[in-house]
Amino acid sequence: MNGQAPTALRYIDWLLTFPLTILTFYVMLKSVTDIKRGMFWRLLVGTLVWVIAQLLGAYGYMSVTLGFLVGIVGWLYIIGELYMGDAGRANASCNNERVQMAFFANRLIITIGFSIYHIGYFIEHLAGGANINSLNIIYNLADVLNKIIFGMIIYSAALEDTKKGNQN
């Protein structure tokens, strides 16, 4: 492989899974509190700005540096929404411990774990590159943390919430 196929597949994956992952915050909060639909759109747009900018940079449709910077802005916008925006405030004021725990843990994954994707982009496109196989291993390990563990946290919170609801 020339490196293009893994990159293309990676971005197809990210265009599908990153918005779903980020929108999980909206779904969690919507299940326990009254929130406005605008949060959904802000999270979706922030995620798409991030992924599409870096895709365009990776494929040369825009400057690699600009793709990196715009992608970082999209990611930071999401983080801002989760910590200081409506999502963060809704989580802080909701009365569901399991949602608050899942929100907190998954917000850390978005903050720390998703930085791996930006570091990989930087290494691959701005720092002279790296072995494509090494990058694929790093991205696959990041996917385990950022997608599978993220999902397991949601599942665990929902399971505990269901058990608690059945006891009342």
Where are the model-predicted features located?
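Polytopic alpha-helical membrane-helix bundles and their juxtamembrane interface segments
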Residues: 1-10, 18-168
